[in-house]
Amino acid sequence: MVIFAPKYKSYIVMKKKNWMMSLLLMPLLAQAGEVTSPNGNVRVKFYTDGDGRPTYEMTYKERPVVLPSRLGLELARDKHASAGMDETDLMDRFTIVDEQTSEFDETWQPVWGETRDIRNHYRELAVTLKREWQKITSATQTGAIGQDLRFHERTIIIRFRVYDDGMGLRYEFPQQKELNYFLIKEERTEFAMAGDHMAWWLPGDYDTQEQETQQTRLSEIRERMQQAVNWGNSSVAVFSPTGVQTSLQMKSQDGLYINIHEAACADYATMHLELVDSQTKALTTKLEGSSNAYTPAPQPSAYPLPKPFTFVSHLTPDATGLKGAMQTPCSTPWRTVMVSDDARDMLSSNLILNLNEPCALDDVSWIHPTKYCGVWWEMIVGKSSWNYTDEFPSIKLEGDAFPNAKTTVVNYAKAKPNGRHGANNEKVKRYIDFAAKNGLDEVLVEGWNVGWEDWANMWKRDVFDFQTPYPDFDIEMLNRYAHSKGVKLLMHHETSSSAQNYERHMEKAFQLMNRYGYDAVKTGYVGDIIPRGDHHYSQSMNNHYLYVVKEAAKHHIMVNAHEATRPTGLCRTYPNLVGNESARGTEYEAFGGSRPDHTCILPFTRLQGGPMDYTPGIFVTRLSEWSDNTSWARITIAGSLALYLTMYSPLQMAADLPEHYERFDDAFQFIRDVPCDWDESIYLEAEPADYITVARKGKGTDNWFVGGKCDENGHQTTLKLDFLDKDKKYACTIYADAPDAHYESNPQAYVITKKTVKAGQTLKLKEAPGGGFAISLIAM
């Protein structure tokens, strides 16, 4: 037997005649490791408890962030595992056999981003653990002991990387005979909170993040859950009355901002969090029964229930109920905890990006930030339609996927147009002209391809071929026309969540894009997943989303994925992933609206993992002014302009109709001017759900842009221009709410002020309820 001394610099070899005695001694050893951040503010301790369970805790400036929390994985007994029905968990009876500490410091340049340079500076603790598991033979079961009890060693590594603003941990599984293939029943990573924190959370759901963020104490999550869920969403799978999604933003009573998320989620299921509260009897294991209700009576685990205010990881299952199929060598995503006593640090953190691998693409010259408009908003509102005809209750497409189809195939050339189809030649040319006139790069066109007549919520596998246009969409002519104007069309591939169908047609669809000069695609995954029974955030679907990004890169195509899994920083490794939706975007302003504080929360939560294609820029907020839709956007025009800065993305849409922007052409000037890529970003003030103010310096220029957005209470700010170059003067244009502006009663009231300013001056600004401001500072 080998027992390592506490510091693991040396070891003692001991021989025991009585192996039972040596086994009993193992959990009594003092085994611990510790690592601090480069500036010393963040401290992480690791040890095994009396049962040999891996345990960690975390502090910030000596204040508790994560109380002692256990780590481990429950594995499934299954014929597909290397150990088969003899499989055992990776939860306890571990011994620390090695501990390595190191420090790493680099500066790297993203292809696009909020800053030109990103520093990646951390200290690392890598702990190697060994576990012995036993196989009990029939002889043992009859009472004999000794040679019938066999032990098999398994080795795992738990790696901690500690930054000045938080830490990441992950499990690593070296290749080994006794742990080759294994199936995850559940990951049991704990995050024990030090109090009843205020939290900004979304209901834990395997299929959607398109919910409104809730703000409650941790102890109030259970009571709020039922009303927090948007049960009418096209795909809902809520798993627990205390389950929440990441990124989870919290604030302690003593003023610490704490965020739990994950980084580099690849070949693994998306992680949710299940809160243990005073009413918790057992942790949920998997979704059962209907597809939109949480498990009513979960069964107790063999392991002790954590204390109240502890979050426990909960992975998204596949159609079998399992959480992951793993082959060593492999690792989990990073589990991240960010912390600071300044809310601005939450927004400026690069921890998630830094925990991802460097860029995997040799050539990135074709990847670029994009500002675009599109044939989209009028369909969302209901003014136009995606489908070309209303003649048929359902359709079947012909082609390679349907060689033996006997059903009558729709002849679109003879079908009666419904007169509302948005993606028609005349309208698309109008958008191209608008983009060219106003310096926009691309025009998104949705509903261009056949199949939209019965596309949604039917669990229909063969719904689109992504290649055949409707009769009134001349794909060759329109691309030629766009290119003649210096504009490109932006492709749309709605999959209707049929991943099987998309993968079957993807190569030909990308070839078509290359043929006509498209360089970006917006993908969509509306509805329940096909293969049936799977979920949007399962291991297999996460692999699908990444497969799309990788295949697109081979064709020099950028990807903007909607309804896909929430981002975890993979855009560093694959920078052609330029956007995701993965939250409640502007489209919901046509579905009842979102609260004014919504966009003051998203940068603290959803945007932690990567940029969001929020599609801002709605100027005519009362939709009934131009359609039959009675919904309305809870924002002012000045607030809409602010979103181009506070909601960072290299892909920004001017989402409203061209004619609406023409009504407010002076305000639209800011959208013309604002870049989508930056050399520097400075968060000037921030508080979750209340307000955000940020200044950004345009990539490769001396120009600065400042945006401020607030909630329904309004906000006043004093803006010090200390970030400007002291040797320059700037032409300053301020787009602000008018004194009587209000998101509900007077959203289109704004004032534009122009002046010359220099560093050191101060601007005083008042943001209306639901409003904001935007400023351009052009170096003279």
Which positions does each model-derived feature cover?
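An acidic-aromatic substrate-binding cleft motif
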Residues: 327-430, 438, 442
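Carbohydrate-binding surface patches
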Residues: 688-730, 773-776
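Catalytic cores of secreted or luminal carbohydrate-active enzymes
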Residues: 638-685
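Hydrophobic h-region of N-terminal signal peptides that target proteins for export
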Residues: 23-32
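N-terminal accessory beta-strand-rich subdomains and adjacent acidic, glycine-rich linkers
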Residues: 34-363
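Catalytic domains of carbohydrate-active enzymes, especially glycoside hydrolases
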Residues: 427-448, 513-519
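C-terminal beta-strand-rich structural cap/linker in extracellular carbohydrate-active enzymes
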Residues: 754-780
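Aromatic- and carboxylate-enriched substrate-binding clefts and catalytic-loop regions
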Residues: 446-636
